[in-house]
């Protein structure tokens, strides 16, 4: 399955959290209004395979159509135990259970309540016993349920009992490749796997591929530091190849000493043989988290930093008000007043939380009118328990 199909299936699984209508006035005598979500509170579920953390799952407050919940696939080890860690923090979990179904959801294979688990410092640790009812190299659906009072949170992944698929070797290869891209002295071995040609754009770090130069793959002149450990997600497992994604955040120091943040995603399609690992495809995307520093404005241009050219934006008919979406945030710029406002953000103000800083939610701008009013929709995974769809706060 290629990367575009993977993303399409992810989008098919997201659901509408809330529709937010926001109006902000650009006159200095009127306060700007912004819509904020509460900080993320719903637990995340982390799965493990051979002591490697994989496939961090985010909860759905509604029951989804599991047929379309194909974002990740989780290998089951030979002991038929699936270790999980629930990062629940202050969110009370009254009961933990799971079910296993056929991929079309019609056949229920297991429906089990987990009685044996430990809970300490806001973390639940458990081993899910997977019944000896799975065929090797066949995919099934695993749905984990967390009961909280009258509410149930649902977490979805595919599972497989891999045979001769070499999943751990593929993960280790991807992690080693990733680390070597930051090692200028030890990166020469990566050239073995690259296929440079003229199809790659070697002028930007926003999109790097197997066809890029080794210089681009090793970050060219960018002097960044990895802020978060790469989050490993497995997208495909079979005898021919495995697909591994690594997500992480890097930081760098800007020209004026300000700290810059970048979301990075690496895509690996690899094949194992007895002789060596083959890299069938590699892609890396890099997107700067917009911070609205003074040097982001240059003449009549607004500089968004290193990012994809595919930016969601809309303006009013006269072009005096421009709204755009950047890495989970909605910004609006008044060209007449030369004022920039952050209208909405999934992120809180304290650091970068993986529940807020992921790509399974987004913002769509509906319209921008001449008065400076912008209508937009927020959609994707629900990371907070919402009793009211929106709330309003003042921005100075």
Predicted regions and their residues:
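Single conserved hydrophobic/aromatic residue that forms the stacking wall/gate
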Residues: 384-395
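Short beta-strand elements that form the blades of beta-propeller/WD-repeat-like
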Residues: 312-326, 331, 371-383
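Short solvent-exposed beta->alpha transition segments
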Residues: 185-233
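Structural signature of eukaryotic scaffold interfaces centered on beta-propeller domains
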Residues: 305-318, 359-373
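Beta-propeller fold detector
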Residues: 341-348, 396
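Short, aromatic-enriched amphipathic alpha-helices that serve as compact interaction elements
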Residues: 166-190
